[in-house]
Amino acid sequence: MERAMEQLNRLTRSLRRARTVELPEDNETAVYTLMPMVMADQHRSVLELLSNSKFDVNYAFGRVKRSLLHIAANCGSVECLVLLLKRGADPNYQDISGCTPLHLAARNGQKKCMSKLLEYNADVNICNNEGLTAIHWLAVNGRTELLHDLVQHVTNVDVEDAMGQTALHVACQNGHKTTVLCLLDSGADINRPNVSGATPLYFACSHGQRDTAQILLLRGAKYLPDKNGVTPLDLCVQGGYGETCDILIQHHPRLFQTLIQMTQNEELRENMLRQVLEHLSQQSEVQYLKILTGLAEVATTNGHKLLSISSSYEAQMKSLLRIVRIFCHVFRIGPSSPNNGNDMGYNGNKTPRNQVFKVRNVSDVFRKINIKEMNLPKHTLIYQATSEQDPLELLWHSLDEWLVLIATELTKNKRDSSNIACILLKQSPLDQQDISLAHQSAIGESGNHDHLLASTRAGDLESCSAIGIQEPVADGQDVISMTANRLSAVIQAFYMCCSCQMPQGMTSPRFIEFVCKHDEVLKCFVTRNPKIIFDHFHFLLECPELMSRFMHIIKAQPFKERCEWFYEHLLAGQPDTDMVHRPVNENDILLVHRDSIFRSSCEVVFKSNCEKLKQGIAVRFHGEEGMGQGVVREWFDILSSEMINPDYALFTQSADGTTFQPNSNSSVNPDHLNYFRFAGEILGLALYHRQLVNIYFTRSFYKHILGIPVNYQDVASIDPEYAKNLQWILDNDISDLGLELTFSVETDVFGAMEEVPLKPGGASILVTQENKAEYVQLVTELRMTRAIQPQINGFLQGFHMFIPPSLIQLFDEYELELLLSGMPEIDVNDWMKNTEYTSGYERDDQVIQWFWEVVQELTQEERVLLLQFVTGSSRVPHGGFAYIMGGSGLQNFTIAAVAYTANLLPTSSTCINMLKLPEYPSKEILKDRLLVALHCGSYGYTMA
């Protein structure tokens, strides 16, 4: 009876408290009963359960073998923690990772739990398996208040973890200022290295912690490298930590020159160097000028080394251009606005010759420098004392003299350039002071290149030795071939420096005049080595006057190389340009309707940001799931075909029936000019992303896109008979024919004939033998240009949003057609040569042999359908099938094996240009199924 009453009481208590009222005898079961109560700090319930239980409070459970005391310390359940300690829980018990309850309390900032654990003699010096103590955990998380309490119990504040790192290391790395101060006040070793030799200052700099680095330096921390020689400054530059770098230089001024010299280290990321120098330059104008001077010094040194034939061209060229790029970046973003000089941008007029090599804005900046105040190296004083020019002016002066020298000798003897061999000599590497003295000497004593030549011809090499010349180049060597690349690289550097002083889009008059002055030599360079154009003469793309001087040489270069140059500059600064199907986000997807693709595409493209379209294109057809490269290609293909839809009246078919040009009567469509702009955007966007369009234009329209004047022969595309008549006029004497032609023509405008003058007063000016050529040109311009000028302007407005005029002029009208529309014919042999096989197929398999036999038998139109079925495009890019694009770049046409079942059709994955071809039992079945797929399944996408 008594036992029954006890059970009834337990039942009642359990129901009232909604929990068990006694622990199971099994520790494993009991601990999981207690654990949620401990986590919730339900100490009364825990006490009640433990009171009548034999449960082992030190029982370790779970994967990491922790006790309930660990759980209480980790969760901050201080009441349960005290209860467990009173019942004999071990405060120093370590889990499988070596952590004690004190470690967990410290890591999570449980102050009360820490205090109670210390009261019960928790050992603060115990390390976990990684060597971390409680003090490490407090330092990692910056728990300074708790650290103050704990250090009183610590015998060694510099206890090391497995990597030799102390609490000070990790506090500095994480930027906890008050924690660092507490540790230092408690006697932490400020210069203690870890196992790799890294000090606390090293750790602070590795994560750009300027505040903790400042504290360490103020407390006397030494500037020490690790065992691999990596310094705190190296770490600051590698991470782009400008503020921390500034702190280091304030305490160790000698590091400034080290930083400047680091611009030559090609292993350091250029953008990180820029970031650091940008921050430093914005601190004060003195600092800004000091950085410019330092960079100019290093650039000048590298430039002169590059002009030395004994140096490594590749290494010195890269180093010079890298330094100059950094210099220009710093120049543009300084705290002051040094771009206040008199240098006006090129506006198409020739610059007066008296402005050649006039000291301009960069030099004006250098004149502000007080050398003594800036404490620069001794050789800098030479520049200031002997010349008004900035350091870079010495390099530009040398460049000018070399070019003048070569021009003079080429003029005297164009076949033999050995006379100047003595001037273009191997030089030993010089330091900056040697170069400074040498060029002051060369400028002051020689005066000009004639003096240098005279002394060289006389055998007097004393003046040559003054600038480090050792021995002449071997006779018979082509001096221009040896020096053209080097001088061209310095010219590129000169252009960059001139450009950084100008408003964007304007070319420095000084550089314009420089190129004009050395025109013949530069043309000689590119004639000998055309690759120089693509490597160093990028300025041609930014100045029409200069481009016109070299255009005949540029267009003589291989089409492939010009294409590479075109895309190199077109895509500069655009990341991941091959992934044109990649959307920035869901809102950037172009959602279009297949049944109204032209109008719906026009709406979404006009609403889209131009820069985002350059970064990536994603297209989805309304009601279809598919997305990816194949869908993008199909969109361009169908959309370009819709442009010539007669319903829009935008383009008319030419006489040959295969090409199109703008319709002079397109105004029947009220929105025609906006549509022309849209057409221009689509073609520009397609060219930008290397997508082909399914449309061919007349040669005259390609000329309009390129800015090339049309001629009477272009009239043949729209009116062959009229073109023959114009040809006849030019070929025959019309003096006595009595044609009575005037400089006006009659034109049909919507059924009404109107007389249109070809020039002012043209109706009263007769066409004669003397002016007939002018007449033919004017009437050609009327038919081919004036009649469609608004349409051309609208198209170019859209096209130039993606393709700059300066870049597209690299090509002629035939090449532009190749770029836009690809090859009109499909070469089956090239197709076979550039096809891959997968999923079980090999080139020699019977099914593959049948497939290619069927392709040979297909009509040209069916081959186009097959190409479109697999790749999403009906055109082959320039260069053939080897250049077909896939979802992530070049992707060969691929045929994959699929198990055969009756009536199974071939399928495709257009994003990867893959034809999934069943293993058909006969050639006849293969051909039948393939044609069904081509004629019935070419459009529409679902997810593969």
From Swiss-Prot:
It catalyses: S-ubiquitinyl-[E2 ubiquitin-conjugating enzyme]-L-cysteine + [acceptor protein]-L-lysine = [E2 ubiquitin-conjugating enzyme]-L-cysteine + N(6)-ubiquitinyl-[acceptor protein]-L-lysine. GO terms for molecular function: small GTPase binding; ubiquitin protein ligase activity; ubiquitin-protein transferase activity. Pathway: Protein modification; protein ubiquitination. This is E3 ubiquitin-protein ligase HACE1. It comes from Xenopus laevis. Residues 609-944 form the HECT domain. It comes from the Eukaryota. One of its GO terms (cellular component) is Golgi membrane. Coiled coil: none annotated. Pfam families: Ank_2, Ank_4, HECT. The gene is hace1.
